Amino acid sequence: GSLDDFLNIITLSYDEFIAQSYFFKIYDKISNFIKYFHQINKIIQSKKNVSSHYDLNEDMYRLFLDKDMQYSCAYFHNQNISLDQAQHDKKKHIIQKLQINENMSVLDIGCGWGGMALQIAKDTGANVKGITLSENQFVTAQRRAQEEGLNEKVTFVLQDYRHETNIYDRIVSVGMFEHVGVN
């Protein structure tokens, strides 16, 4: 046989050994427990995680984000549109899907630099509360609401989503759930 045949036999034998080995079954259970433990995201840890990622110099983010500082989930409905247009289209698409109107209250969980919340208020007249754990994003979002004359319609709060107690007509969260963990 060839070297390739030998490596295939070794690989199959190793996989069989792993599947039947008591030691590796225990190892797998311990490994899964450790993975689960690392995914527990207590509020204090959430704040640290968000800060270490988003409380960096915003100039860095401006190098690769769209002009509205949208972080994820751009909607490229065709290949010929720019990142700015794709992010704008994403916000419009979400607002349309949620059927938001001016009589509604909306919660934006993980609001980032405020782009989604501000767009909702501009397009619909709804009252929007955006929450974030990032101090830099919070300051920028507040400044943007003031500059755009939307501070009567949009409120930004430095808060964990688990502390929110109000009732809303709609809740939106774009690209935040990867930070949630298991708790």
Residue ranges with predicted function:
Residues 162-171:
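A short acidic, Gly/Pro-enriched loop at the edge of an enzyme's catalytic core
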Residues 141-142:
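Conserved SAM-binding loop
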Residues 2-64:
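N-terminal auxiliary segments of SAM/dcSAM-dependent transferases
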Residues 102-110:
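Conserved class I S-adenosyl-L-methionine
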Residues 172-177:
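A conserved beta-strand element that flanks and buttresses the S-adenosyl-L-methionine
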Residues 127-132:
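Conserved SAM-binding motif I beta-strand of class I
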Residues 113-124:
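Conserved SAM-binding loop of SAM-dependent methyltransferases across substrates and taxa
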Residues 148-161:
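Conserved SAM-binding strand-loop segment of SAM-dependent methyltransferases
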